[in-house]
Curated annotation (Swiss-Prot):
EC number per UniProt: 2.1.1.163, 2.1.1.201
UniProt xrefs under CDD domains: AdoMet_MTases (cd02440)
Biological function: Methyltransferase required for the conversion of demethylmenaquinol (DMKH2) to menaquinol (MKH2) and the conversion of 2-polyprenyl-6-methoxy-1,4-benzoquinol (DDMQH2) to 2-polyprenyl-3-methyl-6-methoxy-1,4-benzoquinol (DMQH2).
GO molecular function, one term: 2-methoxy-6-polyprenyl-1,4-benzoquinol methyltransferase activity
Superkingdom, natural source: Bacteria
Protein name according to UniProt: Ubiquinone/menaquinone biosynthesis C-methyltransferase UbiE
Organism: Shewanella oneidensis (strain ATCC 700550 / JCM 31522 / CIP 106686 / LMG 19005 / NCIMB 14063 / MR-1)
Pathway connected to this protein: Quinol/quinone metabolism; menaquinone biosynthesis; menaquinol from 1,4-dihydroxy-2-naphthoate: step 2/2; Cofactor biosynthesis; ubiquinone biosynthesis
Similarity-based family: Belongs to the class I-like SAM-binding methyltransferase superfamily. MenG/UbiE family.
Length: 251
């Protein structure tokens, strides 16, 4: 690349300058933040709750642990972790988008979840936390929106304690042809219409469908985690691989 030539990346199916993607993604989530929880229930038929519940179970969170819920949005995982780690533990809900953070903070405070939760606006590619700080890091439905996923994974590895665990819950690739066809039809024909009806924003849900297709598949993401320094990396497919939970450790 010649001097002065900017790097490019994808925003859905569009090719954009890498330094512009974060602002474009921010626009999506500023637009949908207020109706984010409702839309999650509608577009997944409530199944996202099962995916998140399984993630919590796999985390092994215990009293006294420090947990980073990265790209934590409206706080579904944070609420569960807050209960599990107790008063001697700590949960940090971090998100790059201030609109999502505001919704999450309001929701959790309205539910009385205040004593062990803090909120940080942070970029996953350069986390503002000390080395070896967290016992558990989760990033649920956030990694595909990150511009430099390799940098983000390395940053997560840095702030994770030795013996700590990273859990990446993300949309992935269906394993069977029939499911792929049904999923494509739903994603590109139905989902944007739902977005328009509920959030008055079809474009953001077109981006969602496209961003899922551009995200690395299960085995590629597994190798990316290994390359970032994680060990014993594996994954579990859910709903035929529409979603996968990747797990890796720092030793």
């Amino acid at each position: 690349m010649s001097e002065g030539e900017s790097k490019s990346t994808h925003f859905g199916y569009k090719t954009v300058e890498a330094d512009k993607k974060a602002d474009l993604v921010a626009g999506v989530f500023h637009s949908v933040a207020a109706k984010y929880d409702i839309m999650n229930d509608v577009m997944s038929f409530g199944i996202h709750r099962f995916w998140k519940r399984y993630t919590i179970e796999v985390s092994g969170a215990r009293p006294g642990m420090k947990v980073l819920d990265l790209a934590g949005g409206t706080g579904d995982l944070t609420a569960k972790f807050s209960h599990l780690v107790g008063d001697k533990g700590e949960v940090v809900l971090a998100d790059i988008n201030d609109s999502m953070l505001k919704v999450g903070r309001t929701k959790l405070r309205d539910r009385g979840i205040v004593s062990n939760v803090s909120y940080v606006q942070a970029n996953a590619e350069a986390l503002p936390f000390p080395d070896n700080h967290f016992d558990i890091i989760t990033i649920a439905f956030g990694l595909r929106n990150v511009t430099d996923k390799d940098a983000a994974l390395r940053s997560m590895n840095r702030v994770l304690k030795p013996g700590g665990k990273l859990l990446v819950l993300e949309f992935s690739k269906p394993q069977h042809e029939v499911m792929r066809k049904v999923y494509d039809l739903y994603s590109f024909k139905v989902l944007p219409k739902m977005g328009q009806l509920i959030t008055k924003d079809a474009d953001s849900y077109e981006y969602l469908a496209e961003s899922i297709r551009m995200h690395p598949d299960q085995d590629t993401l597994k190798q990316m985690m290994v390359d970032a320094g994680f060990e014993q990396v594996d994954y579990t497919n859910m709903t035929d691989g529409i979603v996968a939970l990747h797990r890796g450790y720092k030793f």
